[in-house]
């Protein structure tokens, strides 16, 4: 199975076709692990006992044609809880319990992959049929390998207790209460950021509307100025024509130098 998974990963590592491109929301922004941990429904620390292949279904599908020969793309995992569930979780199961996780494999925008006999931190959610699925908050990773860095991060964010022998996480959480008291909740900060971004978008829309109206007003002012210039030019032409006409009329009213004078009345003698 591991060989099949590696082969599938190599196949998917090639350049994707245009129809296979991952489409994320235009307003998408990456979130940190700590922020996504606050938004995840459930966090468990468990070891993978076995892997089982799965056929394409509601939670296992690809945007391109799936062929029967592409085995190993989708699978489920049987895991064993290494610690009691983190506080604040809706999933209440003790250490040593075994769970089945579905919805694992290689997808268009992300991959939820695990290896048998290895331990991981899982972000999980439960669907309406009580199936446990990876909770890919913000379209990002939902499975984290068992490393010292991840142990330190998750033990400072969540309270694990009653872990199996050799799996104690409490050694990293000496300052957990201090961090929890002084840390702003990421969800509220994220909400405030979203609201601020929405406000900025609305302001940008208003600015764009005002700029459009300003351009329209400028065009109207240009047209009015052009009409005014044409009216002034036409007025000057009319004034010049009127002046010439007046001069012609004035010239027609004066007697000509060769014209006969007015006829005098006859002289009467007494």
Swiss-Prot record:
Domain of life, per lineage: Eukaryota
Biological-process GO terms, alphabetical: lipid biosynthetic process; negative regulation of gene expression; negative regulation of lipid biosynthetic process; negative regulation of lipid metabolic process; negative regulation of tumor necrosis factor-mediated signaling pathway; positive regulation of fat cell differentiation; positive regulation of lipid biosynthetic process; signal transduction
Sections of the chain in a coiled coil: 188-251
Protein name: Coiled-coil domain-containing protein 3
Residues bearing attached sugar chains per UniProt: 100
Keyword Coiled coil in record: yes
Subunit note: Homodimer.
Organism: Homo sapiens
Subcellular location: Secreted
Tissue specificity annotation: Expressed in umbilical vein endothelial cells (HUVEC), and at lower levels in aortic smooth muscle cells (HASMC).
Gene assigned in the entry: CCDC3
Signal peptide coordinates: 1-21
UniProt KW keywords: Coiled coil, Glycoprotein, Secreted, Signal
Disulfide bond entries: none
Induction: Up-regulated by pioglitazone and down-regulated by TNF in HUVEC.
């Amino acid at each position: 199975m591991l060989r099949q998974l590696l082969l599938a990963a190599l196949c998917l590592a090639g350049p994707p076709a245009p129809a296979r491109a991952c489409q994320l929301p235009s307003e998408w922004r990456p979130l940190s692990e700590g922020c996504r941990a606050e938004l995840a429904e459930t966090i468990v620390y468990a070891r993978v006992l076995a892997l089982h292949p799965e056929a394409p279904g509601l939670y296992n599908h690809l945007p391109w044609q799936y062929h029967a020969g592409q085995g190993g793309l989708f699978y489920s995992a049987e895991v064993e809880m290494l610690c009691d569930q983190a506080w604040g979780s809706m999933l209440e199961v003790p250490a040593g319990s075994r769970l089945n996780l579905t919805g694992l494999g290689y997808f268009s925008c992300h991959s939820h992959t695990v290896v048998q006999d290895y331990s991981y931190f899982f972000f999980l959610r439960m669907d309406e049929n009580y199936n446990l699925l990876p909770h890919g908050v913000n379209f990002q990773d939902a499975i984290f390998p068992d490393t010292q860095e991840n142990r330190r991060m998750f033990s400072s964010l969540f309270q694990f207790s009653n872990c199996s022998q050799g799996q104690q996480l409490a050694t990293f959480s000496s300052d957990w209460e201090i961090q929890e008291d002084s840390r702003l909740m990421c969800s509220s900060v994220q909400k405030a950021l979203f609201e601020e971004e929405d406000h900025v978008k609305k302001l940008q829309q208003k600015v764009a509307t005002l700029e459009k109206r300003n351009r329209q007003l400028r065009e109207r002012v240009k047209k009015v100025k052009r009409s005014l210039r044409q009216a002034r030019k036409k007025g000057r032409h009319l004034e010049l024509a009127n002046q010439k006409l007046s001069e012609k009329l004035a010239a027609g009213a004066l007697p000509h130098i060769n014209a006969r004078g007015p006829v005098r009345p006859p002289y009467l003698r007494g």
